[in-house]
C-alpha cells in the first residue's frame, strides 16, 4: 500500500494507506437501496465498513474492501467520508479546478489536519507523480471519477467523493456503480 495522508480522530493521528490499485480497487454497487444500515459516521471507516460488510454479500463495496488480503494485511476497509476526503486532498490525480463550496455546503467537510474549505486550486494535483493523471503508468492513479465512502446518507443513498473536482454527493446504493478503493489506518 501507499501513504495517502494523515487524519486526526479525537486527538489520535492515523496515517491512511491506500491498497495497490491492481488488487484494491474495483467498480461496485454500494448495497440494497431501501435498507438503512445506520452506519453514518464521517470519520470511522473501520466500524462503518465492518458493520456494512457483516450485513451480507449484497453490500458489494464494503465487502470487497473487507475481504482484501494483500501485502500481509487483512485490515482493509471502505473509507468514511472524511478519510476519503483526506485521500483526495493528498492524492488528487488531475489539474481540474475544485468545486469551491463554502460554509455547510459539499466541500466544507474539512478533515483534520486540513482546516480550510477547498479553493479552485487547493488541493492541487498531487506531487506524487505515480498518482498523477497522465503518469507513464496508470498503476497507482486514482481515476478522476466517483468513489464510494462507507458513510450512509439515507435509506437509498450513500456518500461519494468525485476525484475530478472534489464534489461531494450522495448516490443511489443499488443502481449506481462507483469505484471502491480499500484503505487501512496505521497509528502515526
What kind of region is each of these model predictions?
Residues 62-75, 81-164:
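An exposed tryptophan-centered "aromatic clamp" motif
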Residues 1-73, 90-93, 164-188:
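Short, compositionally biased
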